[in-house]
Amino acid sequence: MHSLQAKILDPRLGTDFPLPQYATPGSAGLDLRAMLEEDTVLGPGQTLLIPTGLSIHIADPGLAALVLPRSGLGHKHGIVLGNLVGLIDSDYQGELMVSCWNRGESPFTIAVGERIAQLVLVPVVQAHFELVEQFDESQRGAGGFGHSGSH
């Protein structure tokens, strides 16, 4: 398991509400909570930037973090991430924020401390461009969308 530096920015985190944790031994994501001042209604089509009360510093350029939606919120209530996926670079040290979007047809109340997203650490491979005049031939070539089959 990797070590991850974290700062608590909201004193309710770790006292009134648990720190981010893995729900099961096999979980890939740490739950992030809505550290709002009060329960907030998100109307259909609305977006809201929600603080998590936490900042992290990954420090290792070979790692990044992804902020991903919680499957139940999206499937049952239409609550997804406004930016679809949040990317946290290894050198970012600010508060983790979650952009929530209600793509459903009904208002949804986000309760203070509710689990609204998950944080997943992923490996990163940084690349540099090697400029060439032509590529070596491949079987696919420049075939794009739908090129490899109809399904």
From Swiss-Prot:
<feature type="binding site">
    <location>
        <begin position="87"/>
        <end position="89"/>
    </location>
    <ligand>
        <name>substrate</name>
    </ligand>
</feature>
<dbReference type="InterPro" id="IPR036157">
    <property type="entry name" value="dUTPase-like_sf"/>
</dbReference>
<dbReference type="GO" id="GO:0004170">
    <property type="term" value="F:dUTP diphosphatase activity"/>
</dbReference>
<feature type="binding site">
    <location>
        <position position="97"/>
    </location>
    <ligand>
        <name>substrate</name>
    </ligand>
</feature>
<dbReference type="InterPro" id="IPR008181">
    <property type="entry name" value="dUTPase"/>
</dbReference>
<comment type="function">
    <text>This enzyme is involved in nucleotide metabolism: it produces dUMP, the immediate precursor of thymidine nucleotides and it decreases the intracellular concentration of dUTP so that uracil cannot be incorporated into DNA.</text>
</comment>
<keyword id="KW-0460">Magnesium</keyword>
<feature type="binding site">
    <location>
        <begin position="70"/>
        <end position="72"/>
    </location>
    <ligand>
        <name>substrate</name>
    </ligand>
</feature>
<keyword id="KW-0378">Hydrolase</keyword>
<keyword id="KW-0546">Nucleotide metabolism</keyword>
<dbReference type="GO" id="GO:0006226">
    <property type="term" value="P:dUMP biosynthetic process"/>
</dbReference>
<dbReference type="GO" id="GO:0000287">
    <property type="term" value="F:magnesium ion binding"/>
</dbReference>
<dbReference type="InterPro" id="IPR029054">
    <property type="entry name" value="dUTPase-like"/>
</dbReference>
<protein>
    <recommendedName>
        <fullName>Deoxyuridine 5'-triphosphate nucleotidohydrolase</fullName>
        <ecNumber>3.6.1.23</ecNumber>
    </recommendedName>
</protein>
<keyword id="KW-0479">Metal-binding</keyword>
<feature type="binding site">
    <location>
        <position position="83"/>
    </location>
    <ligand>
        <name>substrate</name>
    </ligand>
</feature>
<dbReference type="GO" id="GO:0046081">
    <property type="term" value="P:dUTP catabolic process"/>
</dbReference>
<dbReference type="InterPro" id="IPR033704">
    <property type="entry name" value="dUTPase_trimeric"/>
</dbReference>
<comment type="similarity">
    <text>Belongs to the dUTPase family.</text>
</comment>
<comment type="pathway">
    <text>Pyrimidine metabolism; dUMP biosynthesis; dUMP from dCTP (dUTP route): step 2/2.</text>
</comment>
<dbReference type="Pfam" id="PF00692">
    <property type="entry name" value="dUTPase"/>
</dbReference>
